[in-house]
């Protein structure tokens, strides 16, 4: 995306890995560094997937809280559709304006959940997402590595439809993220999430600032 001047950072991992907490902390820390974090309409805010747009939030409810299980390809295509809307309406304009965007999940969740864990194939799921991505991939993807059993215990509360599928799915998802990390080593960083929140946050911030600095070098600044 040639007109892009911002930085896209995504946090990933199995359910209960702590990514939502770390995404919020990262936004706070980057903002404290004086960086223009989050969308201009909501400075400092994390963008979540599925969601981030009115259409995305509506489909999120179907995906995570619908009354019945969805066929794997239905699930994959709905995620791809909400992602295309997010890219068009939010990500490309905000990155073009030089914002630093922190996302709670993005394309790699589809690759790990639907591509690997659901058995649709990483290449097949990537292919259906590519038109909507319009060439956009993260500058940095942080995968918080946590034992899925610990993650499910951490998640707490009423589980969403995917969390309710239990440990077997989450173990396959964790394996899927490991495959994604090996597939895209230039942008995916595995960070041990089974530590104190503040210690993890230091590592997440360091990786993010490195990505911001690298992006600055790419735009000559």
Residue ranges and their predicted role:
Residues 105, 109-175:
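A glycine- and Lys/Arg-enriched "phosphate-lid" helix/loop adjacent to the NTP-binding pocket
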Residues 16:
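Walker A (P-loop) phosphate-binding loop of P-loop NTPases
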Residues 1-8, 36:
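Extreme N-terminal, non-catalytic leader segments
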Residues 2-3, 25-27, 149-221:
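NTP-dependent small-molecule kinase module
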Residues 11:
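Hydrophobic anchor at the beta1->P-loop junction of P-loop NTPases
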Residues 22:
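Hydrophobic positions on the alpha1 helix immediately C-terminal to the Walker A/P-loop
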Residues 35-133, 203, 207:
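ATP-dependent small-molecule kinase phosphotransfer cores
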Residues 19:
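Conserved lysine of the Walker
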